[in-house]
Amino acid sequence: ALTVGIVTMPFRFEGTKRRSQAEAGVHALREACDTVVVIPNERLLEVLDKSTSMLDAFKIADDVLRQGVQGICDLITEPGLINVDFADVRTIMQGAGTALMGIGFATGENRAVEAAERALRSPLVDTELVSAKGILLSIAGGNDLSLYEVNEAAEVIRAASTDDTNIIFGATVDERLEGQVWVTVVVTGVGQRGGSRPVTPRLERSPQSDDPLEPPSFLQS
């Protein structure tokens, strides 16, 4: 069995008492879970438009939480050219403590490299990969995704880690992603630069829809 917790931390304006309660909850959750992914709502302020209402901000925070769950599930359940199964996920996440998730999206020339780089420098990620113990890497694109591009994206992630990092990756082709490349990384055992390790959202891929996928607004910058 594998137990993964994905939680949000309060906005700063919600007060110190609520934050203290949340930190105590996260600490207790770490004792019961193999891995805990923490989403700091405060970081959302850096990527949301200033005109975003408070109600919409809380909805987005909740949606990020949902996307975090969906992202991990998709790594296992989405059929791929190079599959990532439950055993792979368990290898990376079992007993891993705190984890982060990053996602990058790109189109056009050099899209694979750009998507991988964006996954690493996402505004919701504030950490380095040099001390990572494990990385789950998912590369997705349309029917035009080439083996060369898969290699390019994987090389960006490998170069940001070390030879001791256990990297497991999968590659998926989805016709709705024509012209796009998405790179998702789930990283465990990473040294923090202060605060909880954050997670970036992954756009849900609904099997009921044939419409092209649109990335969240802050991924399109």
PLM region descriptions:
Residues A1-S221:
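Tubulin/FtsZ superfamily GTPase core signature
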